[in-house]
Structures are given as structure tokens and as C-alpha cells.
Amino acid sequence: MTDEETLDPQDWTELRALAHRAVDDAVDYMASLRERPAWEHAPAHVKAHFAGPAPAGPQPVDEIYAEWLEYVRPYQLGNSHPRFWGWVLGTGTPMGVIAEMLAASTDAVCGIYSFVANNYVELQVLDWCKELLGYPLEAGGLLTSGCSASNLIALAVARNAKAGFDVRGEGLAGAPAGTGGAPERLTVYCSAEAHSSLTKAVELLGMGTSSLRRVPADDAMRIDLDALAGMVAEDRAAGLRPVCVVGVAGTTNTGSIDDLPGLADFCAAEDLWFHVDGAFGAWAAIAPESRRLVAGMERADSLAFDLHKWMNLTYPVGCVLVRDAQAQLDTFSLTPSYLAHGEGDRGLTAVDVPWLSDVGFELSRGFHALKVWMSLKEHGTEKFARVIQQNIDQARYLEGLVAAAPELEQALPAQLNIVCFRYVGRGGGGTAPDGAAQEDPDGAARDNAALDQLNKEIELELQERGIAVPSVSTINGRKYLHVAVANHRSRREDFDLLVREVVRLGGELSEG
């Protein structure tokens, strides 16, 4: 008789010892982040370590763990470090680590089956999000892996709700005939500054990239409402069918916030679905001093946002809220016979809370909600609001440092928590911050090209030396250092150091 096998350890004591060590090492790592480089470039031998075939036989767990410590942990993105500001990524929290471990310990599934506590946790978290962001409690919603998924879900609901025909049953080929007899094309509108996930969403929804109308931005990098109105009118006159406008609460490049009340009014007047991509900026709504910045967001038909960005929860967890819960259900609900449920009061398929698999495209879903639930309980919403306001205040502090340094030039005033500036040297160079050309346009172009290259090199030196992690944004054709302040571990002295190092490196690189 063949012995039956399991993937459990033969010696639970050995596993317990490793688990205790792993927890101790993880806590030590988090507690010492400030002492570590902001980022470390993985050397060639680390990359080479991950070549080779899958192991046919077992390896001692201590050796596997040693590989993690030597080859993986030191070479992370660095977003948990206090001086990581290159992109809005969030930094994680210790409670999030514990929550992820607890969820994994039960191999937790969420969103399907009845009388499973995980579902109750997610539904409560969704209600908390609605409450915090001023959304009606009767709205639909779902936790996701992030705003890429959230935007996809929201645009799918918008497409189906506003298409004017049965998209689920007929597909886009079922659209009524437009100009020239071809099926009427559905169109979506967003700012030229809106996130690339919207492009992927319209592609995946079968609408095609050409159906996403990128509207010019104004001088403040917000969607131009007059241009939007003109594009919608022109498309209708050409036989197209506009269905949705996307407003952005915090653009990736500059943190700019579209005129959300204006967009809400426009969509109401034009019978268009109003979606807001609030990936990080939506959370300004919970900070009393800054809530006004995202006023109008609560009027959206759908709202996408992340909790792993400005709420600093462990990756991944995002959310989508849909004002018309039935429209979300109509877009995604599907119950095959092997998942029939909703009868009786006993067993895993009895009448209980709604199955969240009916309001999104995923059936297999992890327990994203636990880290949100535990972290909000640990700190309370008021502390999260204070941290968000702290970041906004730190961005204003950084703006002051930049203004006080004659070698630096800011691209445009920060609307939220992103500051974009560049090193120009004491003599300046290129064009003025408002884009006005200098007297010698050819010389200005040369200066701008040199400054672009110089600021890119400053970015790389800051990263490679482990000093700090900014990124580079292109604004009005010029490159600026991009500092996204969404880090609960950052302190004002970190920004003092950043400015000193930018000025120092700029001077060194200019001379060299």
C-alpha cells in the first residue's frame, strides 16, 4: 500500500521555530527601515540566482529562508522606506503584516459561500469606505487588487448601463447602426493626464483605444471642460455614442484634481456616466482641512480608489463603489449550477449575505478585507486623516524649501501632495516656469535639453546611492523631479535632506 502524503510538515516544532524567527526578523526589518538605504540595486549575481529549473526534490526550510534573507529581502522596491517618494505607492503597516499572515494561515477565501465570516468583514469594510468618502450606504461595491481592476469594473458597468442595448447578450457588435451603417461606437472621455489603466480598461472591454477620448488639460493640469463639451458634441454629431466621463482626483504626474463639481454637472446635463478615478486623492476627503479639494467626488456614479496607496495598507487592496448597486449586479451576476445558492438556512449555499462574486469579474478572491479591518480598528479613522493631512502639509513644506533655494525651480503649484521641481543652478536656464521662451529660443532649447539630462541624472544618483527615491515626470515637455508625499514614515527633516542633496548633486554633476 502506498503511503499517502501531505504538504504539512512532519515536525510542526521546526515550523513553529522558523515562523517565530521570521516574525522577529520582519519586525526588526520594519523597525530599522530608517537605518537602511532607500533602495538597493540588485547586483548581477542576485539576478543570476533565479535562473535554473524547478526543484524536483525538497530543500531544508532553513536554507530556503536563508535565500530569502540574502537574495530577496534586501532588494525590494523600497516603498516602505521613509524617503521613498517616487510614486504614490504607500508604505505598509506592521498590523497589515500580521493580518496577511493570519489570512494566509486559514487559506482564506472571500466573497462566495454562506455563513463565512470573511464576507461579513469585507461588507463592513465596504460600508466604512462609503461612510468615509460620503457615498450612499445602499451603493454597490467590491474590494479589488487595485485601481486597475476597480476602473475596469466601473467602466464595464458604465458601458452596459449607458450603451442603449444589451451588451452582455449581444456584445459590441449588437450596437445599433451608426454613421456608414457600422455599429455605433461607444466613447469614454478623460483628461490627457489620466492614468494609463483607463486605456487598458477600454481595450479589455472591446471598445478600442480610439474610443478613449483624451481631453486636453488646462494650465493646472486639469481636464478642460470647454474642450470636453466640444469633443462630446462633435462625437455625437459624427454618429458616436458618448457613455462616460472620467474625472481624476489626483493625477499621477502632478496630483492635479479635475473640476469634479463641474464634471458632475456636465454629466448630469448630458446623461453620461460620471466615474472618478481617485486612486490616492480620494482619501483627501477624510482630512477635514483638505476635504474641499475633492468636493463633488461624492456625486460620481462610480468611484475607484486604492487602500494600499495613501491609506498605506499592505499590497494589494483597492476598491470600487457603484452608486447603482443593481447596475453593478446586472453587469457581472452569473450563477452556474455548481454555484447555485440562496435557498434555506443551512450549509454553505444557504440564504445569507450577497455573494461578491456577482459584482465583479473574479470568483477566486483572497481576504483583502482583513488588513483593512484590523488596521482601521487599530488606529481609528481620525489618525488616518491626520496622517493624510500631515503628508499634504509636508508637501507644502517642501514647496517652501524649493522656493527658498535659488538653484531649484518648481513646475507648478501643488494641488495635493505631489511636488515637481528641477535643478536649474543659480543662473537658471531653459524657459521660465510658465513656459515662456527666453530671448534666445535656440539657446533655451539647448538649456532645457541639458537640464532634462541633468535632472534625470540627479534622480538616478539619489536612487543608486540609497539617499532617497524620487522619480522624474515630464511636464510641458520638460523633466522634473517628482516627489509624491504619501508616506506615513516621512518627517520634515527628510525633505530638508532631499533638497540639500539635490542642490549638492546638481552642483557636482554640472561641474563634472
PLM region descriptions:
Residues 2-138, 463-468, 481, 486, ...:
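N-terminal entrance/gating region of PLP-dependent enzymes' catalytic architecture
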Residues 94-183, 191, 197-198:
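Well-ordered mid-protein domain cores that form the structural environment of catalytic cofactors
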Residues 149-329:
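Conserved PLP-enzyme active-site core in the AAT-like
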Residues 251, 270, 286, 295-405:
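Active-site C-terminal subdomain of aminotransferase-like
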Residues 409-414, 470-475:
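Short beta-strand
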Residues 410-430, 434, 440-462:
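Conserved PLP-binding catalytic core of the aspartate aminotransferase-like
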Residues 443-445, 474-512:
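PLP-dependent enzyme catalytic core of the Aspartate aminotransferase-like
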